[in-house]
From Swiss-Prot:
Subcellular location per the Swiss-Prot or TrEMBL entry: Cytoplasm
GO biological process: division septum assembly; FtsZ-dependent cytokinesis; protein polymerization
Residues in the signal sequence: none
Gene designation per UniProt: ftsZ
GO molecular function, one term: GTPase activity
The keyword Protease is assigned to this record: no
Taxon lineage: Bacteria, Pseudomonadati, Pseudomonadota, Gammaproteobacteria, Pseudomonadales
SUPFAM superfamilies noted in UniProt: Tubulin C-terminal domain-like, Tubulin nucleotide-binding domain-like
Role: Essential cell division protein that forms a contractile ring structure (Z ring) at the future cell division site. The regulation of the ring assembly controls the timing and the location of cell division. One of the functions of the FtsZ ring is to recruit other cell division proteins to the septum to produce a new cell wall between the dividing cells. Binds GTP and shows GTPase activity.
Subunit structure: Homodimer. Polymerizes to form a dynamic ring structure in a strictly GTP-dependent manner. Interacts directly with several other division proteins.
InterPro entries: Cell_div_FtsZ, Cell_div_FtsZ_CS, FtsZ/CetZ, FtsZ_C, Tub_FtsZ_C, Tubulin/FtsZ-like_C, Tubulin/FtsZ_2-layer-sand-dom, Tubulin/FtsZ_GTPase_sf
Gene Ontology cellular component list: cell division site; cytoplasm
Protein name: Cell division protein FtsZ
């Protein structure tokens, strides 16, 4: 008798954990966006801030350290709070395949706790991606320095890192934009990235891209960029792809030489081969010759005219080796530098002057010099050799 065994693997588990006040706001935004197939967690040291969070899982950090009153903008307090609840962090991440960590850098809880959470996730073998924001310049140099140090520590434990400078919000939206709409725009970057990755992994496609492909492209890659684009009309493929790779809110990174690229195209049954080719051509333009490129397609029967493109580019910011120019750093004076570039002509040795000879008349001196020169030219041996030649030959030579 045969027994049916279900060997179909379970769908990969994706979680988003917002750390601190900024991370909690981002999680709230995504919960309202109704992103399917993703679990949300919010971690904070401030008990009051956790009361208004719509996440399914709430994780209060460091009650013994902070007494539920927050980290007081001190990253070290945030770090100690995360270390205190390290085991609880591991519990909420149990069974996770991929985790997004989001926070606003420069404060206490997010800056200090996010690197610890990333460290725990990496130790558990979870594909870890961080999406963080940098402070506004007017928030002060001290806060910016704290943020930079936090990003540096976070980068050591995550597979891929996406940075959004708040300053870009002013540039793109203008000073008249409301504060709520500005931060919602930044949260849209994270929401778009999470939704795009979720669609790539969980929605089967005609040309399928699975979680193993995502891990290959995003694992241990460092600086990353994620973008989504949507367009309709005759040039929808090109317009959607260009919108996905030109997100104005992301940190200024050079897309040239990306080492890993993941692309997902979602469209209706009218997706053409030419459109598929257009997307690939644009992607090829900024990929390095040795890049790992994965392009998948999902055909959605409910879509009409619209085409969605999700692009994940990783391994960005690699330095291009330039020819090495050898420079002599030896200190030189201005006179030495001039003499080195303008060498003086070689002076020939002049014979010593015989002042006694100058007492003789010029005519006699010239005759003496002429006689000496003629005598120097005459060689007695030459005359003897000349006589050895037979006379008839000497006459012919003369």
């Amino acid at each position: 008798m045969f027994e049916l065994v279900d060997n179909v693997p379970q769908s990969p588990v994706i979680k988003v954990i917002g750390v601190g006040g900024g991370g909690g706001n981002a999680v709230n935004h995504m919960v309202k966006s109704s992103i399917e197939g993703v679990e949300f967690i919010c971690a904070n040291t401030d008990a009051q801030a956790l009361k208004n969070i719509g996440a399914r899982t709430i994780l209060q950090l460091g009650t013994g350290v902070t007494k539920g009153l927050g980290a007081g903008a001190n990253p070290e307090v945030g770090r100690q709070a995360a270390l205190e609840d390290r085991e609880r962090i591991a519990e909420v991440l149990q069974g996770t395949n991929m985790v997004f960590i989001t926070t606003g850098m420069g404060g206490g809880t997010g800056t200090g706790a996010a690197p610890i959470i990333a460290e725990v996730a990496k130790e558990m073998g979870i594909l870890t991606v961080a999406v963080v924001t940098r402070p506004f310049p007017f928030e002060g140099r001290k806060r910016m320095q704290i943020a930079d140090e936090g990003i540096r520590m976070l980068a050591e434990s995550v597979d891929s890192l996406i940075t959004i400078p708040n300053e870009k919000l002013l540039t793109i939206l203008g000073k008249d934009a409301s504060l709520l709409s500005a931060f919602a725009k930044a949260d849209d970057v994270l929401a778009g990235a999470v939704r795009g990755i979720s669609d790539i992994i969980k929605r089967p496609g005609m040309i399928n891209v699975d979680f193993a492909d995502v891990r290959t492209v995003m694992g241990e890659m460092g600086m990353a960029m994620m973008g989504t684009g949507c367009a309709s009309g005759p040039n929808r493929a090109r317009e959607a792809t260009e919108a996905a790779i030109r997100n104005p809110l992301l940190e200024d990174v050079n897309l040239q030489g990306a080492r890993g690229i993941l692309v997902n195209i979602t469209a209706g049954p009218d997706l053409s081969l030419g459109e598929y080719s257009d997307v690939g051509s644009i992607i090829e333009a900024f990929a390095s010759d040795h890049a790992m490129v994965k392009v998948g397609t999902v055909i959605d029967p409910d879509m009409r005219d619209e085409l969605h493109v999700t692009v994940v580019a990783t391994g960005l910011g690699a330095r291009i080796e330039k020819p090495v120019k050898v420079v002599d750093n030896t200190l030189q004076t201005a006179q030495q530098a001039y003499e080195a570039s303008n060498p003086a002509p070689v002076r020939q040795e002049q014979p010593a002057v015989n002042y006694r000879d100058l007492e003789r008349p010029t005519v006699m001196r010239n005759q003496a010099h002429a006689g000496a020169a003629a005598a120097a030219k005459l060689n007695p041996q030459d005359d003897l050799d000349y006589l050895d030649i037979p006379a008839f030959l000497r006459r012919q030579a003369d």
